[in-house]
């Protein structure tokens, strides 16, 4: 069971071919207006689900695990604690529970253990960390980082697509994700830094711990892929919340050889240039290419509200040509020409 149908779970469903389990049902609240909508796997459109109302779920159905996505905003909107309600239902009906948020799980962990059930959430446990007096491992295998200029650019989907393409070529890829559903989609390790994550520990210990994890994976793989969320450099310096501190931790721990930079079609060229220069200078890396997300923000003339608009093929070609001329590196549309992007990677490391 998967609930609700939000960004993270949409990604999980569309890339279900990468999972080691079968999704039986997809659920949401009726007020979302998504109930009865059909959703499908991206790789096989014949595998699909009709979104069902969670209030009508029969907990006696034959499923063993409930996947609960980020529900903080939904709980506030509905004035209802979905985590507590679903955790109690799982205990009552002997179901395992996977939770993307790391909130209040301590109140239920013992109860799940006593019933032989698991309650899982991704988090960074520095208890596994061995002190190294500050020494960093040199990662001997190529490290590729998918970075961006903002949130909501399809960075995780791009990582999954690249990993799929590389593995089809026989390249062993170790994938470290910052998305809470990463392990469900075959990632080797999850370092959550998005909504609802709880990253504890001193910055130096965190960097050393992640560096050790990445070094371990490099021993058995041909290439390391990491992805960071949201922006890679500050939008401004007026508020600490705009500082990409968690992103920097992961990039410092991996020291990427190459960055693939996701950008928006409406990003200023100055901001993109600042990002490229920072990534290349701070991490001694190479920004190999840009990947443009094909959605633009438009203002509704009647309501004055912003809404997303997908750019036409012609509009995208103009933007791609402009960025290629301005920055002198290849530019791709997100979701298109992934094989060409992989060829760029292989050529760089050859």
Each PLM stretch: what is its role?
Residues 99, 146-153, 197-201:
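Flexible, glycine/proline-enriched loop segments at strand-loop-helix junctions
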Residues 99-114, 120, 126, 207-210, ...:
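Conserved catalytic-core segment of NTP-binding enzymes
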Residues 185-233:
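Conserved nucleotide-sensing/catalytic segment adjacent to the nucleotide-binding pocket
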